[in-house]
């Protein structure tokens, strides 16, 4: 455990007794260092190590401490004002800085400081919360939201109105993770630390939380909390044991390898299942 982490961990344990007046300058500086590291990609709340996702809980704790200790302030957005504890990421960004970042931000695309946005990403009028990590080549479409500490892989498309859940409110143990080359359909919601593995396609209007049944029609298995790599997923229902009712589920209708995913359009993958 490094000294920065140790300071954050200790402060979080004693958070009930903390206030801006009682917090040390070392703690305030440590929190700001974490927020800056999250903002520029030096830190990330979760990362894949040896094929498994590891969550750095202390970084999340630093974000929570910032909410407790930092006062609200006026944020001038030009067309109106906001009043919040966390400033916006691009408030003071120059034309040169935008050009160097390689990010395109459409008017009303909102990103909080402490979220990392990699190059070749396009943000339509959308919202990205603090602690989120968005890798290269991502499209965040209109009215989509990327929640606090969510992890978005390379070349992901998050369609209009889709929601990727956060972990801060309500407090969740692990962030929601969308791995590389995934497509998230319009108005879908993926929350509560669900992991969508690489090369998967989530159809429009699919809702995934930790309690959502994920039915694999190929194997007949039911699982929770994770979509396997290369899955094509649609919304469905499973009947009760007595046949009196059915309840919502997500259905894995097929699984494709990376080569097939690269050759076949997303629309073709989804439409192929309408004939079954």
Curated annotation (Swiss-Prot):
The UniProt record lists the EC number as 2.3.1.117
SUPFAM superfamilies, A to Z: Trimeric LpxA-like enzymes
Q: Where does it live in the cell? A: Cytoplasm
Q: CDD domains of this UniProt entry? A: LbH_THP_succinylT
User: What is the name attached to this protein's record?
Assistant: 2,3,4,5-tetrahydropyridine-2,6-dicarboxylate N-succinyltransferase
InterPro entries from the UniProt entry: DapD_Trfase_Hexpep_rpt_fam (IPR005664), Hexapep (IPR001451), THP_succinylTrfase_dom1 (IPR023180), THP_succinylTrfase_N_sf (IPR037133), Trimer_LpxA-like_sf (IPR011004)
For this UniProt entry, the molecular function terms from Gene Ontology, in alphabetical order, are: 2,3,4,5-tetrahydropyridine-2,6-dicarboxylate N-succinyltransferase activity; nucleotidyltransferase activity
The domain of life for this entry's organism is Bacteria
């Amino acid at each position: 455990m490094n000294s920065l982490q140790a300071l954050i961990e200790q402060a979080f344990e004693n958070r009930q007794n903390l206030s801006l007046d009682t917090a040390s300058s070392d703690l305030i500086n440590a929190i700001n260092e974490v927020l800056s590291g999250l903002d520029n990609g030096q830190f990330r709340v979760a990362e894949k190590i040896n094929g498994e996702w590891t969550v750095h809980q202390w970084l999340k704790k630093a974000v929570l401490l910032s909410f407790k200790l930092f006062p609200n302030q006026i944020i001038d957005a030009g067309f109106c004002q906001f009043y919040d504890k966390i400033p916006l990421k691009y408030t003071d960004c120059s034309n040169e800085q935008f050009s160097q970042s390689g990010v395109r931000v459409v008017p009303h695309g909102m990103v909080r400081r402490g979220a990392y946005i990699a190059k070749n990403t396009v943000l339509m009028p959308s919202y990205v919360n603090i602690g989120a990590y968005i890798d290269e080549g991502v499209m965040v479409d209109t009215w989509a939201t990327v929640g606090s500490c969510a992890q978005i892989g390379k070349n992901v498309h998050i369609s209009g109105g889709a929601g990727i859940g956060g972990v801060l409110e309500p407090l969740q143990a692990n962030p929601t993770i969308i791995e590389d080359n995934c497509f998230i359909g319009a108005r879908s919601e993926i929350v509560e630390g669900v992991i969508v593995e690489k090369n998967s396609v989530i159809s429009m209007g699919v809702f995934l939380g930790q309690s959502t049944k994920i039915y694999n029609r190929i194997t007949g298995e039911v699982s929770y909390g994770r979509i396997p790599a290369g899955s094509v997923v649609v919304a469905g229902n499973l009947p009760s044991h007595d046949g009196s009712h059915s309840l919502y589920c997500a259905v894995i209708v097929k699984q494709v390898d990376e080569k097939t995913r690269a050759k076949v359009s997303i629309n073709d993958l989804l439409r192929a299942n309408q004939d079954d």
